[in-house]
Structure formats: structure tokens, C-alpha cells
């Protein structure tokens, strides 16, 4: 292991009781506690002369840290990276799509190796499949009073304001759909720090019996959900991949029978598809097994229903209206279509009906990144302020653009030459087609879905919001495509 770095004169001395190892990259001493009588912490003890008789090795569970070789067995029993018992709501691949390997050739031609003719054929298929689709969405750029103070706080920089504007618009759209209210459970997919749920909770004020389930597959620092102390709001964080989440086994939903509102801000690619399946297929199926009518059948048999979104009342079964549905609504900001996957995609039937399959989907998802590639180039060449450009860089860092982004300087890497504007239009068509499959899926499941722009592209290049509510006759007029 690397020997302890020499102490920099400007750094001073290590804190008493702390490790004496100087971290060159951070220009400071390690802040870990050293054992009594030792100069270094366990991680850096191998560098010290007094500890060189004991060998440290990489932990086999997580090579990001080391452990004494003679204490490996003991360490493996308590290592934070050890596999933990699966919770009751974990069911392997319950929200995954059907695996059909026969539809995808073993070796697809890399996108960069496509001939000019192959690329032209793909673009022709894309344009034919997109005929009749509305290539632009309605503007639903909104805000909400709950974020007024934060949006006008001078201490918030451009990056923070950018995210606050998006959260405010999502919150405004949730309210417009009449999904803000008491006695329900908000499930935030890809929750991260939980800030979207945080603002929903603030907007609800003193609403009774509100639960929040925050789903995130990785450990997250600086979470905000742990700071809430309202007696009528309960926050629960589930560290699990959405692909394996069985919502009807989560205790609060199993026992409380609260209607669910699925929300998410920038739910990347495949995560959107497994989240939709988690909500409208896996979760709804648990109620159908209890001899409750499927949503689509209830809508067909109830043409006179005027209430678009009735809340489940707390109490006995007799208090629950006949039109109660497990999923009250869905509001998800989409992004990263290049991270979609044919196996998990919910719009397979839509693609097949258009004569398209896994191969076309494979290439369309990669070309979808051109939508924001073209916009980024035009922004860089415009009079956009440096602050706005920094915000765009931050957005690109938050959501990886994938390996198929093309800038203006390397258009010749494609078979034939496509201008930035042409790539941008093609990318948008790819996104539109993928999203259209999701809309059809939701319609078939008894929902009235829609796509809308929820924020300005200068705030976020990924500015499309997917919303859906149960398609009762009265809601179909208000929530059209």
C-alpha cells in the first residue's frame, strides 16, 4: 500500500485521536478514528511501520475497502456490503418483461458500423411508424405556492433553482389532476434524496393519513425524508430495484388499502417501464385476485360514473366507494430513452402492430439521444448565458447521455452526413414512438394517459411529463391525449 504522504507545511497537524495519514487527493489528513495507541486508522494501518507485520487485503464483497487478512472471516459477518435477507416485498423480476431472446440476434451490428443504406432504411421505418402522431405536446408548465419561498431564495444557486422549477411544475400538474389530498399513498420511484416527496408533503399541509413510499435501489446521502415529523405523514424508504418490488406486500398498502399515486422526477429509461408495470399490472393484479373487477372492466360497465378520482375513505369496506381504484394516478417526468430495454418495454404490442420489433427498438433507443444532442449544440452556439450552460452540463452529468451522442463536429462518423437539426428531429421521433407505446399500454390497462411539456428546455432538455388517471367517462374529456 502507498506510504503515508508527507505532511504539507500549510496543512498543520492531524487531530488528536484521528488517523495521521495524509490524503494527497483531498489535501488533508484522514479523519477516521485511530485505535488507542495507534497513529493510523485500520484502512491506512498497512502503511505504517508499526503495523507492517499484518497484511491487509481487498474485501471480497466490496473491493472499495480493505480488511486484515487474519480477520477476514469476522469481517465478512458484519460487512455492510454483505447480502442481506430479502424483504417480504422482494420478488425476483416481478415487474420485468418476458424474456424472449429469440427476437434479438446474438450479434447486432454496432450503430457506428451501419451502412448508409441501413441507416436510411431505419429512418424510413421510423418516419412511417410516426405518421399521424402529434410531434409536439401541450405546454403544462406550472408552479405551486409550496415552492414560492424556495424559488425566490437568493441563497439557492442556478442549479438548485433549475430543479426547484421542475419540482414546482410537477407538483402543479399533480394538483391539476386532483391527486393532492388526504388518505392516499404517494410512491416516488427513483426517489434519490426524496425531494419531490418532500415538496408534496409540504403542499399537503395538514392532510390526514398520508403515506410516502420512497423507492431507490442505492444508498443515498443527504436524504430529506428523515427530517419530517408531521404526525399525519409517514415516510418509508425502500432500498430495492423497482424491477423486484411487489407493492401489495408493503405493509402500509397491504393493511391500509390506500389509493396509490405514482410519482417520479427523471425516471431513467427502463425504470419508467418497470414502474408502470409495478403500478398498473403487479399492484392492480392483487386486487383482481380478491374478486374485485379489473379497472378496464369497471369503466366499461359504469358509463354513468361522473367522479374521476374518488378517494378511499379510512375505515371499513362499506366506506369505500364502488369506483375506488388501487392506482389513483401517475405523474412521471421521463428521461434517458437510450437506457430503455426491449425486454422490459411495456409497448411491445404497439411496436409489433407497426411491423417493428426488437432490432428496430434497439437502434431507435440509441438514436433517441440525438434529441438532446442537437439541442445541446444549438445552446452552446447561442447567446445563452454561462449560467444556463452550466445548468445544462449539470443536467447531463445527472443523467448520463450514453455512448451514442454526436456533436456537430463528428457528424461524419455516421454513414452519410446528417445535420444537427436532422439528428434532433430524428431523436425526438424516437422518443415520441417509444412513449406512444407506453400510452397505448396505459390505455389498455384502463387509464387515460397524456404527454405534456412540464418545463422549458432551457431548464431541462428532458422536459416531457407522463400523466395518467383512471379513464372514467368524465375524466376522458378533461385528460385527453
UniProtKB/Swiss-Prot annotation:
Keywords: Coiled coil, Metal-binding, Methyltransferase, S-adenosyl-L-methionine, Transferase, tRNA processing, Zinc, Zinc-finger. The keyword Zinc applies. Residues 296-319, 379-414 are annotated as: Disordered. The keyword Cell membrane does not apply. Zn(2+) binds at residues 59, 65, 75, 79. Residues 113-140 form a coiled coil. Its EC number is 2.1.1.225. GO terms for molecular function: tRNA 2'-O-methyltransferase activity; zinc ion binding. It catalyses: cytidine(4) in tRNA(Pro) + S-adenosyl-L-methionine = 2'-O-methylcytidine(4) in tRNA(Pro) + S-adenosyl-L-homocysteine + H(+); cytidine(4) in tRNA(Gly)(GCC) + S-adenosyl-L-methionine = 2'-O-methylcytidine(4) in tRNA(Gly)(GCC) + S-adenosyl-L-homocysteine + H(+); adenosine(4) in tRNA(His) + S-adenosyl-L-methionine = 2'-O-methyladenosine(4) in tRNA(His) + S-adenosyl-L-homocysteine + H(+). It is an enzyme of class 2 (transferase). GO terms for biological process: tRNA methylation. A zinc finger (CHHC U11-48K-type) spans 56-83. It holds the Pfam family zf-TRM13_CCCH. InterPro entries: Methyltransferase_TRM13, Trm13, TRM13/UPF0224_CHHC_Znf_dom, Znf_CCCH-type_TRM13. Residues 385-407 have a biased composition (Basic and acidic residues). Belongs to the methyltransferase TRM13 family. tRNA methylase which 2'-O-methylates cytidine(4) in tRNA(Pro) and tRNA(Gly)(GCC), and adenosine(4) in tRNA(His). This is tRNA:m(4)X modification enzyme TRM13 homolog. The gene is Trmt13.
Amino acid at each position: 500500500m502507498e506510504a503515508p504522504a508527507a505532511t504539507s507545511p500549510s496543512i498543520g497537524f492531524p487531530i488528536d485521536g484521528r488517523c495521521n495519514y495524509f490524503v494527497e487527493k483531498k489535501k488533508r489528513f484522514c479523519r477516521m478514528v485511530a485505535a488507542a495507541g495507534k497513529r493510523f486508522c485500520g484502512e491506512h494501518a498497512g502503511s505504517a511501520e508499526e503495523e507492517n507485520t499484518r497484511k491487509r487485503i481487498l474485501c471480497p464483497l466490496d473491493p472499495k475497502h480493505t480488511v486484515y487478512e487474519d480477520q477476514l472471516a469476522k469481517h465478512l459477518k458484519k460487512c455492510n456490503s454483505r447480502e442481506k435477507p430479502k424483504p417480504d416485498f422482494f420478488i425476483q423480476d416481478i415487474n420485468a418483461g418476458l424474456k424472449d431472446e429469440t427476437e434479438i440476434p446474438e450479434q447486432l451490428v454496432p450503430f457506428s458500423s451501419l451502412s448508409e443504406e441501413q441507416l436510411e432504411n431505419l429512418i424510413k421505418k421510423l418516419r412511417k411508424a410516426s405518421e399521424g402522431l402529434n410531434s409536439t405536446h401541450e405546454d403544462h408548465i406550472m408552479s405551486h405556492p409550496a415552492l414560492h419561498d424556495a424559488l425566490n431564495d437568493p441563497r439557492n444557486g442556478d442549479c438548485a433553482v433549475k430543479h426547484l422549477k421542475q419540482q414546482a411544475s410537477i407538483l402543479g400538474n399533480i394538483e391539476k389532476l386532483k391527486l393532492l389530498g388526504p388518505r392516499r399513498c404517494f410512491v416516488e420511484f427513483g426517489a434519490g434524496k426524496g425531494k419531490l416527496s418532500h415538496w408534496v408533503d409540504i403542499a399537503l399541509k395538514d392532510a390526514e393519513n398520508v403515506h410516502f413510499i420512497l423507492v431507490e435501489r442505492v444508498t443515498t446521502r443527504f436524504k430529506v425524508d428523515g427530517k419530517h415529523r408531521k404526525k399525519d405523514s409517514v415516510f418509508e424508504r425502500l432500498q430495492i430495484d423497482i424491477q423486484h418490488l411487489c407493492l401489495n406486500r408493503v405493509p402500509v398498502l397491504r393493511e391500509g388499502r390506500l389509493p396509490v399515486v405514482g410519482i417520479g422526477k427523471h425516471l431513467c429509461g427502463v425504470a419508467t417501464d418497470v414502474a408502470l408495470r409495478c403500478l398498473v399490472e403487479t399492484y392492480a393484479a392483487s386486487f383482481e385476485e380478491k374478486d374485485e373487477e379489473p379497472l378496464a372492466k369497471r369503466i366499461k360497465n359504469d358509463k354513468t360514473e361522473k367522479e374521476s378520482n374518488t378517494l378511499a375513505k379510512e375505515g371499513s369496506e362499506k366506506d369505500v366507494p364502488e369506483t375506488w381504484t388501487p392506482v389513483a394516478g401517475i405523474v412521471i417526468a421521463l428521461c434517458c430513452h437510450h437506457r430503455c430495454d426491449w425486454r422490459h418495454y411495456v409497448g411491445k404490442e404497439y411496436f409489433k402492430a407497426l411491423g417493428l420489433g426488437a432490432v428496430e427498438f434497439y437502434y431507435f433507443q440509441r438514436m433517441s439521444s440525438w434529441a438532446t444532442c442537437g439541442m445541446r449544440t444549438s445552446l452552446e452556439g447561442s447567446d445563452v448565458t454561462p449560467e444556463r450552460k452550466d445548468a445544462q452540463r449539470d443536467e447531463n452529468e445527472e443523467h448520463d447521455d450514453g455512448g451514442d451522442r454526436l456533436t456537430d463536429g463528428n457528424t461524419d462518423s455516421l454513414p452519410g452526413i446528417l445535420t444537427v437539426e436532422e439528428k434532433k428531429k430524428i431523436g425526438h421521433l424516437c422518443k415520441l414512438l417509444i412513449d406512444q407505446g407506453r400510452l397505448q399500454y396505459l390505455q389498455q390497462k384502463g387509464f387515460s394517459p397524456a404527454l405534456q411539456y412540464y418545463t422549458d428546455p432551457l431548464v431541462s432538455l428532458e422536459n416531457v411529463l407522463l400523466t395518467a388517471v383512471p379513464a372514467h367517462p368524465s375524466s376522458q374529456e378533461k385528460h385527453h391525449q
